[in-house]
């Protein structure tokens, strides 16, 4: 029996175009000025220190760090430091009402229904935990943060690595065969399945003929009875 559901965001709960056409450009446009002004702030200094370690350049100055971050954005690198800094910048955008977190129409209602059935809900995304909370806290459907019991990002590992799902199961404290992972990327689902999880693939756009996972187009098409242990 499924006791907890862990969901991805991009392409799963939310249109990937919101991330790539709204969030990413918003942070990119403001990144350099923001870092020059706030590099000494504690919440900014910490990811910059992590970035120096990632680059193996402990003496890198702010301009070198800015250049590296733009390179990471061009490469779509899943850098934990970059994701943290983007999340800080996005926070002001959400709070100022510049945008709201996109959700597919059925997502909020189905998440609420699952919670009412007694399931625990979690998020696992390559975006920082801060960014995840902002998207759901300032979503099209209002503040959905009370629906979730926890959030995971790349601090637990990369999404295509089996160890990441073992880590999450350990932190949640629920057996792998009672966990369901929702994602649009079959390689991520492969890793979760290898860790003993149940899996379901969201097909929001193009079909994925390479996948070996159950597929649905919407959250309200997911039948938890099909995932009995």
UniProtKB/Swiss-Prot annotation:
Entry keyword annotation includes Transcription: no
The answer on whether this UniProt entry bears the keyword Transmembrane reads: no
Which cofactor names does the annotation list? Answer: Mg(2+)
Write out the pathway annotation from the protein's UniProt entry. Answer: Amino-acid biosynthesis; L-methionine biosynthesis via salvage pathway; L-methionine from S-methyl-5-thio-alpha-D-ribose 1-phosphate: step 3/6; Amino-acid biosynthesis; L-methionine biosynthesis via salvage pathway; L-methionine from S-methyl-5-thio-alpha-D-ribose 1-phosphate: step 4/6
Q: Name one Pfam family in it.
A: Hydrolase
- What are the UniProt keywords, alphabetically? Amino-acid biosynthesis, Hydrolase, Magnesium, Metal-binding, Methionine biosynthesis
Top EC class of this enzyme: hydrolase
The UniProt catalytic activity note for this protein reads: 5-methylsulfanyl-2,3-dioxopentyl phosphate + H2O = 1,2-dihydroxy-5-(methylsulfanyl)pent-1-en-3-one + phosphate
Assembly state and interactors?
A: Monomer.
Protein name, entry field: Enolase-phosphatase E1
């Amino acid at each position: 029996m499924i006791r907890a559901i862990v969901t991805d965001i991009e392409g799963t709960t939310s249109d990937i175009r919101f991330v790539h056409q709204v969030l990413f450009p918003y942070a990119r446009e403001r990144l350099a000025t923001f870092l020059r002004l706030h590099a000494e702030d504690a919440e900014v200094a910490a990811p910059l220190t992590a970035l120096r370690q990632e680059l193996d350049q402990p003496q890198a100055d702010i301009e070198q760090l800015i250049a590296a971050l733009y390179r990471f954005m061009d490469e779509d690198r899943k850098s934990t430091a970059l994701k943290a800094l983007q999340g800080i910048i996005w926070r002001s955008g959400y709070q100022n009402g510049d945008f709201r977190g996109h959700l597919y129409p059925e997502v909020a209602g189905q998440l609420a229904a699952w919670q009412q059935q007694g399931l625990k809900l979690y998020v696992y995304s390559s975006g920082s935990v801060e960014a995840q909370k902002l998207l759901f806290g300032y979503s099209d459907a209002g503040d959905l943060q009370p629906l979730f019991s926890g959030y995971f990002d790349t601090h637990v590992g990369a999404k295509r690595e089996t160890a990441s799902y073992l880590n999450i199961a350990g932190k949640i404290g629920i057996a792998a065969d009672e966990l369901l992972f929702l994602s649009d990327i079959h390689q991520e689902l492969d890793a979760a399945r290898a860790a003993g999880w149940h899996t379901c693939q969201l097909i929001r756009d193009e079909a994925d003929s390479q996948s070996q996972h159950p597929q649905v187009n919407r959250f309200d098409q997911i039948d938890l009875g099909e995932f009995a242990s």
